[in-house]
């Protein structure tokens, strides 16, 4: 009964008294049990929620870090790991490359280290990065170049192969749109400013190379005529006149030559070289005088100054002795007639020989002796009286130096009163003037030889005879027994 009572009491109490209590207790218990059972879960949830709560912070921090890493490593740890071990991932296996080699250089970004396909070029500092790094840094870096910290005005987008990067100096890395601009940058920034010693050495090396032409160099590329006029001309201008002057005696002796008159003016402008002053001066003056004497078309003022005045009639007693005798006039005037009948010999070298004999040269100071023949003479009767200063190399000794006094007549001919050569007056000589004419074509001689067929001289004529004049030897006439003895002089 106790048990039943207890049960009833329990039921009653539970029903009457404890109903509310039970109702109250059950939810409490249930709540407590649920709380006790659920508390660990919320704790775990809290811990989990705390972890995720921290995780987003970590994600945010990691996002920031990844952004920085993306700036530095292009996409965080994954790209960083690939960047750290590129050889193990790509270059360990053998590959077979097909296609042609691309010579376009590939540059790597200094921020992410990856090859650049599209450049982001900073203006005005001209440094390049990959376009993503350039844009990202422009947003974060307050428009400052990460390479040089210079302000960036704008960013150009360039494709691979369109830029030329300076690699002469480590750390320069400026880019240019053409090879010419890159070379100008190298010359301006690195060759001049960065290497003064090298520039000095180059300046020392270049000047000797520059005067020639290639090299050279822009200051050496000048017109050749200006160079010849300024540097080499003295010798060339002096050497140029002889060819036309040498040809004048053979071909153009009757024509006025502009190039004959021009070289003296040229020579007056250009100073001759010191080693050949005397030789060149004598040669040119000789040619000038001979041309002016023998070519009557020259200017009258200059020819009149140098030609002897018209001669006075010579004494009559000169004619009988010299008329039939082989007339030996200026040896240079004997040779030219052969040029009408035989091919001209090569002219000897134009070396002047001023005569050392003052008595011979004193009579005709206006003539200088040269081995080269002057232009040939044209038709006129031959001169009769030989000029004293011109009887040089091809005459016998006694004709080179006429006796000072009149020789004794031996064969009935009138005496020849020939004064000494230094007393000859050019005014009294019938000597190669425009009025009287010049040498004629060949004339006969007692020996049967004519000047037209005389052999051409092969070399310089023999030096002038230095013997003293024979005092009593008469001048030979056509009937002189010793005339044949002197024939070798003319053959």
Curated annotation (Swiss-Prot):
Enzyme class: transferase
Source organism phylogeny: Eukaryota, Metazoa, Chordata, Craniata, Vertebrata
Compositional bias (Polar residues): 427-442
Zinc finger regions, RING-type: 109-149
Entry comment describing in which tissues the protein is expressed: Detected in heart, brain, spleen, lung, liver, skeletal muscle, kidney and testis.
Protein name: E3 ubiquitin-protein ligase Hakai
Region of interest (HYB domain), residue spans: 148-206
GO molecular function terms attached to this record: identical protein binding; ubiquitin protein ligase activity; zinc ion binding
């Amino acid at each position: 009964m106790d048990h039943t009572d207890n049960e009833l009491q329990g039921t009653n109490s539970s029903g009457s008294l404890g109903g509310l209590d039970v109702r109250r207790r059950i939810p409490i218990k249930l709540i407590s049990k649920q709380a006790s059972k659920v508390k660990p879960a919320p704790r775990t949830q809290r811990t989990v929620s705390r972890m995720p709560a921290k995780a987003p912070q970590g994600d945010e921090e990691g996002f920031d870090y990844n952004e920085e890493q993306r700036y530095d490593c292009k996409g965080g740890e994954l790209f960083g790991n690939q960047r750290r071990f590129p050889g193990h991932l790509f270059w360990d296996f053998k590959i077979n490359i097909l296609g042609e080699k691309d010579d376009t250089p590939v540059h790597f970004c200094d921020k992410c280290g990856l090859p650049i396909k599209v450049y982001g070029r900073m203006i005005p500092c001209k440094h390049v990065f990959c376009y993503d790094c350039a844009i990202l840094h422009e947003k974060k870096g307050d428009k400052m170049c990460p390479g040089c910290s210079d302000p960036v005005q704008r960013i150009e987008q360039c494709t691979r192969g369109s830029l030329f990067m300076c690699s002469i100096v480590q750390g320069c890395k400026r880019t240019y749109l053409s090879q010419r601009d890159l070379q100008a940058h190298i010359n301006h920034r690195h060759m001049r400013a960065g290497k003064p010693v090298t520039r000095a050495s180059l300046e020392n090396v270049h000047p000797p190379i520059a005067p020639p032409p290639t090299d050279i160099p822009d200051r050496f590329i000048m017109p050749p005529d200006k160079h010849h006029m300024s540097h080499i001309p003295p010798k060339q201008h002096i050497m140029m006149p002889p060819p036309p002057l040498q040809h004048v005696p053979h071909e153009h002796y009757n024509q006025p030559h502009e190039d004959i008159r021009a070289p003296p003016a040229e020579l007056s402008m250009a100073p001759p070289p010191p080693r050949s002053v005397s030789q060149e001066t004598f040669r040119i003056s000789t040619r000038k005088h001979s041309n002016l004497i023998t070519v009557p078309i020259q200017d009258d003022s200059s020819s009149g100054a140098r030609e002897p005045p018209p001669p006075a009639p010579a004494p009559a007693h000169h004619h009988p002795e010299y008329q039939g005798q082989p007339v030996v006039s200026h040896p240079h005037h004997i040779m030219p007639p052969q040029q009408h009948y035989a091919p001209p010999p090569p002219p000897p070298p134009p070396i002047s020989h001023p005569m050392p004999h003052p008595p011979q040269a004193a009579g005709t100071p206006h003539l200088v002796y040269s081995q080269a023949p002057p232009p040939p003479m044209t038709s006129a009767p031959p001169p009769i009286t030989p000029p004293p200063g011109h009887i040089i190399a091809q005459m016998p000794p006694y004709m080179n130096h006429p006796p000072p006094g009149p020789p004794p007549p031996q064969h009935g001919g009138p005496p020849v009163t020939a004064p000494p050569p230094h007393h000859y007056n050019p005014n009294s000589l019938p000597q190669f003037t425009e009025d009287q004419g010049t040498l004629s074509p060949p004339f006969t001689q007692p020996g049967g030889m004519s000047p037209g067929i005389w052999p051409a001289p092969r070399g310089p004529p023999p030096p002038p005879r230095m013997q003293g004049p024979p005092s009593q030897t008469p001048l030979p006439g056509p009937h002189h027994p010793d005339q044949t003895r002197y024939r070798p002089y003319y053959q």
